[in-house]
Regions:
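Enzymes that bind and transform nitrogen-containing heteroaromatic metabolites
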Residues: 1-135
Length: 135
């Protein structure tokens, strides 16, 4: 499995339920890397997408504790282990914070876009790989 993320200089990834910013070159990179591959994400991350809809041309494996949550074009799982049991090796973990933390030890590659600035008030963070000896 692999992860893909955009972080600021403090490894922040979000603020107030949204991404820190939307950079067209990074969005294109994300699209190039993930198109044709399964993506694993949480329900709150899905809510940040245009229209709150699953990504096109990808198998969307979505974690949600809400049994009534059933977005068209997505497969919903209430337990991470159930989602991982169906996730092939080429799956991309795409957020959010909790899912990254729970799956990082299962990833063999992390694609990081590092923004050389900080976002005051950021409230969601990716594990700091600069301080992780294994990375």
């Amino acid at each position: 499995m692999q992860a893909i993320v955009a972080v600021d200089q403090n490894w922040a990834i979000g603020k107030d339920g949204d991404q820190l910013c939307y950079l067209p070159p990074d969005l294109k990179r994300f699209q190039r890397r993930t198109t044709g591959h399964p993506v694993l994400l949480g329900r709150k991350t899905l809510a940040t997408f245009p229209g709150g809809r699953p990504l096109k041309n990808r198998r969307n494996l979505i974690l949600s504790r809400n049994p009534a949550f059933a977005p068209e074009g997505g497969e919903v799982f209430s337990a991470l282990d159930d989602a991982l049991a169906t996730a092939p090796a080429d799956t991309f973990v795409i957020g959010g914070e909790s899912l990254y933390r729970q799956t990082l030890d299962r990833c063999d590659t992390v694609y990081v876009t590092k923004l050389h600035r900080s976002f005051p008030g950021a409230d969601r963070f990716f594990p700091n790989l600069d301080q992780a000896p294994a990375w």
